[in-house]
Amino acid sequence: MRGKWNIIIWILVLLAAFYCGMYWYANRESMEEVHKTALLVEEEISGPDSENRDETDDSLVQERFLEIFAEASSEGDAAIQKVKLFVTGKNAYFFLPSYCKADSIALYYDEHQYALAVEERIIPSGTMISVDSAAAYAMTLTKEDGTKAEYELSVMQSENLPSIFITTANHSMDYINDMKGNYEPGHLVCVNDSGGTDCDAALEKVKLHGFTSLSVPKKTYQVDFSKEQDLLGMGSALHWIFQANAYDKSYMRNKLAYEMFRGMTSGYAVESVFADVYFNGEYAGNYLICEKVEAGVNRIDLADNAAAYTADSTKGQVLEEEDIRYYDTQDADTSGGYLIETQNVLVPSDLQRMSEEDSYFVSYSGRYEIRWPKEISKTQISYIQDYMKQVETQIAGCVTEEDYRQLAEVIDMDSFAVMYLIDLIANDVDANAYSTFYYKLPEHQGGKLYAGPVWDYDRGFGNEERNVMVNVNGYWNGLCEALYRNPFFRNRVRDLYHERFVPLTETILRAFLEETPDRLSLSVRMDSVRWQNNLDRLNYSYDCFDDEVAFLSYYFDERAAIASEWINETGVYHMVTFTVPEGTSKSCFVRDGELLTASVLSFMKEELECGIWSREDGSVYQQGRPVFGNMTLYGSTEILE
């Protein structure tokens, strides 16, 4: 009996499968039509740009801003700003500034293009709806032909931070982002976190800024006002930098370096403020709004009078000789101030960091780009070139107390000591190679050379494998490191460490590391959603903001402990010298019993252009062995198979 029922069941299963197959075959054309329609909806709603996206990268295909705007009332007197809807996959987001009343928003869109429904209720354009940032809502866009696209809508809001809204002439960032040097005029509105208007002014230029940062989707920008403006209480100026911090998942490394320098120096230090930035209504992310390192009244005051900073260009011709580039102006006055920036790699590609109009000179330690005067004459550039060669020669020969005393009449020792301390702790891979500034005061202000201000430390503080190490001076060695060989300079570094760095760490820096993450957290959440699939992080980044912040705090404490041992000479360190047949050599220091890291070996190979490292007896150096004494490693151009 049981066998009979089994046969009946199998017959029924086969019949069901047969009829399902027939049903699919009969309806396959209509199902394909539905699939095509769904694709058409996605294509039409996402806009024509989607056709030009990389079809193999789903994140790029699906991420875009739609012409749907949210408007929330302000807590203060600032004009209400509309923000665009951002969609990624089947998720949609409105990123609201901190000053808004976010419990309700008005939605605006083109009703001739499609209808918008939230929780199955049609929302006419201009209608106010209640929202909760903790909730998600079903949103449907329906075109006139009935095709639909469905999303899960979330409303996110920042807090504690000011918001900056920039509108460009073409209402798009495409042209600006296409190439460095492209720019558009525009308008900027800055609103503080309580809804008050901080700045409302015309922009002469919005353009890209930086070099390495150009390779990531979240760009760094420079904005130039038509007239000087005081932005976020940092003093009136024409030029401002919006640092994206795209390489830094903590968002805090640049600000940490700037605050360290500000707290320890009596010279000029960059001011900066975190803000949420919107371009043409599109949320661009969390940015660090910074003073540009330049000569100016509220910057580094190097001119005889304020009018010199805004004087029209003479449009002189750019001339170039073997080791200098200058303008054919006839200015023979060399007594003014100078601002220079290191561009230390003496290879042709290094010039790619500068435009054809940028002046430079080559000294013993490398190439320096001229930041002031704007159009430097041959007389002036020859003067500052000779001056820097003299300084470098004095530093190289600074051994005795008398050498130190004479050098102190030429350079500001404290600023050099402070920069040494910051580079020691930050351990930035670009230290002394790029973005390292020096300025020489005019003769009527004493004429001394100052180190600083520090700039661009987002790849420091453990953000690359090369600087996650206990090695000292495992980066480019500059003037400060060369000067550290003098015992009297070491004494000054030690004094400043105790007089300024230790108290600063116990108060301002510790508070910064503990309190800033809370201030940034909601803004960072929005930034992470906006750029989640496009962030180009470095070797030692963690997956989330909280973990990266914890690591930054840990790394800072570890490097501060190493600095204490090194400066106070309480720890045992050994010098490892790297040398090549041509006679060039570099060195770093390793704590007793620690490893000479692979990243330092790789860095030295790249720096000295060698293939392998060998000991004095010719044996190949075996990585991974602890260092217990001074040693010399010899480089070879031979490539180790």
Predicted stretch roles:
Residues 6-9, 19-159:
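Beta-rich interaction/scaffold domains
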